[in-house]
Amino acid sequence: MATTNTFSDFKLASELPAWAKLQELYEKKGKTLSLKEAFATDEQRFQKYSRTFSNHDGSKILFDFSKNLVDDEILGALAQLAREANVTQLRDQMFNGEHINSTEDRAVYHVALRNRANKPMYVDGKNVAPEVDAVLQHMKEFSEQVRSGAWKGYTGKSIKDVVNIGIGGSDLGPVMVTEALKHYAGPLKVHFVSNIDGTHLAETLKEVDPETTLFLVASKTFTTAETITNATSAKNWFLSKTGNNPAHISKHFAALSTNETEVAKFGIDTKNMFGFESWVGGRYSVWSAIGLSVALYIGFDQFEDFLKGAEAVDKHFTSTPIEDNIPLLGGLLSVWYNNFFDAQTHLVVPFDQYLHRFPAYLQQLSMESNGKSVTRGNVFANYSTGSILFGEPATNAQHSFFQLVHQGTKVIPSDFILAAQSHNPIENNLHQKMLASNFFAQAEALMVGKDEAQVKAEGATGGLVPHKVFSGNRPTTSILVQKITPANLGALIAYYEHVTFTEGAIWNINSFDQWGVELGKVLAKVIGKDLDTTGETTSHDASTNGLINQFKAWL
């Protein structure tokens, strides 16, 4: 049962005075605001609407918001909306360990996981900092043993491969981060198994040797159906290859879990169990023990730097006024487009191959957090909430869906991300400069477009002219990073976490539960029993019955 909502004094964002003001501003100027004119009439627009974040190590990230459909008055009204929605109060309650996840009566305290300053952080009167630090120290010792070769498998050989078995937040984060930080990889290869489709596990097991493989079973409860099924199958494979001796399991399996009983029952030595608390949501768990595969891959010192980068954004988010608060501005712009321009999507395009899984990671972060239709006031929202987030790395994306972004009928607010310095500056930075030129050109093209006169001046005539016109005035945020390092990746993730938080706070929804994933799981268990029977299934609707029966006939 949902606890009494004490975190907002409004039921619907649409009831707030600033919401009505923004609707008025949209009609008056927002829907006709010309970015080309805005730049022509204000030479300081770039300086005025861009912000530079300084990371803990002195590296910088530039956030250019100037190509967005706003002016001073609109930004002022958005800031007022944040004040009326008590965004900063809710933020402070989150950082103070209060139970802002009202439907599950839990704190939302992933920020405590990157508290490398080790300042006291309390949940229910208990300082959790020592406990967080103890888990990190355990991760450090374990990862250094494995990476150095001191940890031996059952035949005395060192570990060469790590297989992380998890799903959702126990998979997406580590997959994305290990891909993004591949440049920092050490001696170990990492593999990830998430899908219950047996192909995922089978293909992974073809690549590893049981004598030199360490399996990480990532499930907080150690009861997640897909993960435990995959882990059990991996264990059976391991035993079948190693003389069926259960004593060998302890050298080749570790658990990222809090369920000591089930972990021990599985055969894992509980000394090799890494826990995390109920106040860590799955999609925010890469900072926790779930990040062990990352620490094994890039080394603990780099993993800690990753945490410190996120911590630096937390510091900025909690101490900077609304008008200069980078994640808050990002979230407010998202609300502006979603609710006043009727934008249904949010495009994120990393101009960086290492970040190729970043959009998929952000999909879960954004859509599982804010894909809600009921507010914290326990009423249905009468406005649009979570955006459909999508993206692919560029320049590949330019050759697939950018046609729709440039000339389609929808408003698609877009974030473009580029690292100025490549880890692979081949051909004297030729590739990097080509990549960067596309990063700058795409944002410029989306803004300036190409009118009929320009098309005709280029020689087009007749019916071809309208096909070559670009309307322009399409909003983008450009994020320019000095280099993709552990600290800067941590900062980018934390930026999007707090953007997501800001959106949810404005919409007055609980961004930290995920009841929408439950119903399908329940029905899957029921249908699983149907699939074990030989007779015809008749207990569902005609479509589901028909599909099940055809599957059984073909199985």
Swiss-Prot record:
Residues binding D-glucose 6-phosphate, per UniProt: G169, S170, S219, K220, T221, F222, T223, T224, Q364, E368, H399, K521
Pfam families recorded: PGI (PF00342)
Main enzyme class: isomerase
Subunit structure: Homodimer.
Protein's recorded name: Glucose-6-phosphate isomerase
InterPro entries for this protein: G6P_Isomerase, G6P_Isomerase_C, Phosphoglucose_isomerase_CS, SIS_dom_sf, SIS_PGI_1, SIS_PGI_2
E.C. number: 5.3.1.9
Reactions mediated catalytically: alpha-D-glucose 6-phosphate = beta-D-fructose 6-phosphate
Active site residues according to the UniProt entry: E368 (proton donor), H399, K521
Record keyword Cell inner membrane present: no
Keywords per UniProt: Cytoplasm, Gluconeogenesis, Glycolysis, Isomerase
Pathway stated in the Swiss-Prot or TrEMBL entry: Carbohydrate degradation; glycolysis; D-glyceraldehyde 3-phosphate and glycerone phosphate from D-glucose: step 2/4
Source organism of this protein record: Eremothecium gossypii (strain ATCC 10895 / CBS 109.51 / FGSC 9923 / NRRL Y-1056) (Yeast)
Listed NCBIfam families: PRK00179.1
UniProt GO BP: gluconeogenesis; glucose 6-phosphate metabolic process; glycolytic process
Family: Belongs to the GPI family.
